[in-house]
């Protein structure tokens, strides 16, 4: 029983890793934005006047 659970967990982790690699290869992005992630194709601009 314990062996089956470990095998299922290993299978799930492998599929998750493959999905992450596929997203990075195909879309050139990251799965979850973080401080080390680079944003591409996004331009952020400041407002010229503060509402306060």
From Swiss-Prot:
Keywords: Cell outer membrane, Lipoprotein, Membrane, Palmitate, Plasmid, Signal. Pfam families: Lysis_col (PF02402). GO terms for biological process: cytolysis. Residues 1-17 form the signal peptide. Disulfide bonds: none annotated. It comes from the Bacteria. A lipid is attached at residue 18 (S-diacylglycerol cysteine). Its main location: membrane. A lipid is attached at residue 18 (N-palmitoyl cysteine). The keyword Cytoplasm does not apply. It is found in: Cell outer membrane. It is a lipid-anchor. GO terms for cellular component: cell outer membrane. PROSITE patterns: PROKAR_LIPOPROTEIN. Lysis proteins are required for both colicin release and partial cell lysis. This is Lysis protein for colicin N. It comes from Escherichia coli.
């Amino acid at each position: 029983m314990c062996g089956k659970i470990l095998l299922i967990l290993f299978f799930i982790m492998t599929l998750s890793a493959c999905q992450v690699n596929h997203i990075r290869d195909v879309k050139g992005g990251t799965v979850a934005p973080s401080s080390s992630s680079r944003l591409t194709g996004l331009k952020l601009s400041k407002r010229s006047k503060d509402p306060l």
